[in-house]
Amino acid sequence: MAKTIDFLASDGEDNFAARTISATSKPNRNDATASSSKPQKRARRSTKGSDDDGNDDFDIASSLLASAAEPAAVGMLSSSQQASQKAYASRVSAKDDDDDDARFIASVMQHANIKAGLEVAKKALSGKNKGKNKLGSGVVTGGGSFQSMGLHPSLLRSLLIRGFTTPTPIQRQAIPAIMSQPPRDVVGMARTGSGKTLAYLIPLINRLNGRHSPTFGIKSLILCPSRELAVQILRVGKEIARGWKADAGEGQDSRGEAIRWAIIVGGESLDEQFGIMSNNPDVVIATPGRMLHLTVEMNLDLKSVEYVVFDEADRLFEMGFAEQLEEMLLRLPPTRQTLLFSATLPKKLVEFTKAGLQANPKLVRLDADSKISADLRMAFFSVKPSEKEAALLVLLRDVIGVPLGEQAARDLDEEAQFNEDASDNQADGQRSRGYGNRRAEFKGKTKDKHLGNKRKRGGPGGALELLPHQTIIFCATKHHVEYLLLLLTTTGYACSHIYSSLDQATRGIQMSRFRRGQNSLLIVTDVAARGIDLPVLEHVVNFDFPPQPRTFVHRVGRTARAGRNGWAWSMCTNAELPYLCDLQLFLARPLVSSHTAIAALANGRDVASADALGLHDSLILGTLPREALDLETEFISSSLTNTSSSTAHDFPALRAVADRAQQKYEKSIAKASQESHRRAKEMVKLGSIEQINIRTASGREGQVPEWTLAGSPLEEMAVHDVVKRPEVYGLNRANKADAVTSALGSDRMDDKVKRGTDNALKEADEAAKRAALLAKVNAFRPQETVFEIGIRGDATPLGALMRSRRQTMQVKTKRAEALEARKRAIEGGGDAMEDDEEVTKPKVAARNKGKKKATAGKADNDEAVVGDAMVDMEQADEADILAAFDTTKPSKAQVQREALTDSETDASESDRDAASARHTKRARTKKAAPTSYRDPNFYLSYEQQGSTSERGYSLNNARSHTDSFIQQASAVSFDLAGDDATLGTQSQRPNVTRWDSKKKNFIQATVGADNKKMIRTESGVRLPASFRSGRYEDWKREKRIDMPKTGEIESNNHRVHERSPPETSVMGLKRFRHTKLSAPKTAGVFGNRRPGQPKRQAAKDEVKSARQIQKDRELKEKRREKNARPSKSDTNRRAKRGAARRGRGGHGPRGASR
């Protein structure tokens, strides 16, 4: 502020300067900003700002501060209040001036970076610089490109070299918001594979200027939920920050030290991580648990953190990380910039208040409607719980076509050739299934043959023939992972496995083998569902269906990334159908059965020649072939257990463990909504044997129900179209045909392809006939029971009983059929049935009347009910009433609807007369019209539009909408203890005891009996005492290191203040040398000995002094009194005295033995 006043005073604005000083308030912020960007117009704008008429902006800070022009108001305040008010005004003005200065500096640097970035882009496009600086053809300029964001030229060059020419939508909106001044918190949401990692790494590197800061303290902190994700972020960040050239100042070198990165994850040695943190890293990528452990153990000062990122924020803020984040957030400074990124984020930012967001964060929420990639194709299979393993083997062998055995990874030359082929294929406008598409575009243009080997962005070392078959399998628990690992390894597949409690070194080895293509399958829990980029991955299998839609989005997000195609295969049991219905509501996509969809697509034509189903925008549910399932089930139950190998012993044990884990897993997961449970029950009921009997009785014997699930009699008729025709979808058979073509050549391939196509069609035809025959056999119901075989009439009581029972069941079956037909007519799903009923209504009425006369003496009431429901007393609908009574004039919408229906059905009803056709069309129009009472213009629903998706995104959806009212009320209620009843009495605690295995007895289980000691941190949070064990102090004493305080400057020689031993030390031990030069001393000093020879000691005097004799006597007396026995001399003296008495004829001593 003082600088601005001096500047204005030098320009002749003394009056305005004096008025500004007396007011002790800041100028208008807009004016200050503009003046800082255009210094030559400051005086003019300041004059304009001083006019009361021309200043339309209102400054809250200026209005709240007292002005010198108001003497009355100032006079009413005391001197201390006036002083405090002036001090507050000065602080506000200083802060605003700092913000204006920072904004001005940022704008100047941004303009300079944009200008320099354009030069970098031009050089790259024109090809003036050869080698690494040369880029492929493409447009890299424009409003949405990276160089228009004001990035540093070195960072822009690094992005362009690696093929990142155009930012993704999330990067285009998030990066400018993050880099704005003053810094603003950002909450970003975009689907998986959309580039969220670069959206926060690019501003991070640009903010650190690509160089290491000599000031001690962490500058940026990135928190992520899993270790693999942390390693991936570290690899991407180091790659982007490589090759940075800093701006050289006066007397400085442009080649400074690169950014120091640190990764802090669990499973690693604490001593190594102590050394990493003492190395003063700039960026720390960590998991919350281990980072909190180091923070408490080392007592880290996090006040220097300016940039905090919560990657996969919805997972971080769930219950598992509440304690870790609470303590860490209290240690972070309030002036930090906080970023939250995830693929599934709720719209309500109230759920993220723990992150300490500022008052006005920016929400960037993209792809909220699509949620998953448009290149992802999904297939859902209905399976029995006991046949899940068999279904997995059928899927891997017959559909995906995963090869058996461990595959050898390609060498670097073959990989480079493959990347060049992939880049050439992209010229046709198609996205290759090879990895590293962006990298391949630039890689083929460079002359550096080793450049591509350094950056394997799509996954290092993937083998060419393994790319279409790399598959990741998601399971519920680690016990399922171990069980499937044994099963698939025994079957012959090369598998890797990862779960949370696995050792970190083993996890790295397993992931590396899968990335290099040696293993075809990766069996994991949900620990690998977050953020891990596996570009070679094309197939994702959900062995256990995810209970939450958010989990499904993250699982299938591992494939179909960066424009590549991908497949998601999900197995669903009848118990998991409600979760599938919840997923359908969350994705807002239709859920249809495979046989219904393919029949509608064929439209009366041959099913084999129909087009492929739209698996991108629909959820298609089908079954698997029964023959293949039976073969695999027999293999698992017999072949694996009836051997003498160790597998036969381990397999049943692991299966039992997995079954028990499944039971506990089902108890712990959230429940689906009540509406989804209702729909799931209806789906299961439609394929039951009772509904099949109803259809058979009504003359629809050959009709397949809409929903035919696994275990129903007609499941063979509902096999998924992907399994029946995999070549249509480019799966197993197409890959085999390509392999045969490459092996035999194009000349000999014509006959082979034709012969193979004929065989495939013949096999498909035979499979369809076999499925139809098996479906008829499964749906067969005999006309007679075992009590009626070979018996005529009512010869036996059991035969008469079954005959009467059958008549009663027929009545109930007809009643259920009528109810089902009416329900379909109301819901709009029975249009075809209504047409048939209109044509055959007279025949049905005549048949029912004949049945009434024949059975007049039996079940009159029941037949009357059936007749009432079907014919005699059928309730008239709205169309019949309107046809008989013209009560009101039809509305405009009704007239338009009738006209549209008339124009569509004229061709099909041209043979009828005009009056009859008009009446029929009017009635059909009224029946087909929606019967809902909701007017879209005025109806207010009890739910907000899009509430289903928001419930799926919600973090606490386990108790928000899935539970009943009683459960929700119990979660938020609390009880108060009655004071009157126990007033004046001592409350007794229950006698809770537990068995101690060491003491072999029951002991009292009191507080602290579990031996879990807690400590309270400075912020008041209680943490386990193991977080402060003193290992860091021991490590400092062992390494002889003194950690600098936050904000201090590093020393030139050492990164930390290390008390290093002398240079001549050996193995850390001190070694001193004689370096002092002085004259030797005379020999008289040492006597006859040499220098360094020890002194000769005199002989020990053996004559005791009186004091020593007295001490020895005292010690001897103490020993005698302690022993309580007479000494040996006393015993001898007593014996001699007795002998003398016996010699003189006297008696011995009293009590002596004779």
Curated annotation (Swiss-Prot):
Residues 438-451, 1043-1061, 1098-1133 have a biased composition (Basic and acidic residues). A motif (Q motif) lies at residues 144-172. A motif (DEAD box) lies at residues 311-314. Its EC number is 3.6.4.13. Pfam families: DBP10CT, DEAD, Helicase_C. Residues 446-602 form the Helicase C-terminal domain. Belongs to the DEAD box helicase family. DDX54/DBP10 subfamily. The Q motif is unique to and characteristic of the DEAD box family of RNA helicases and controls ATP binding and hydrolysis. This is ATP-dependent RNA helicase DBP10. The lineage of its organism: Eukaryota, Fungi, Dikarya, Basidiomycota, Ustilaginomycotina.
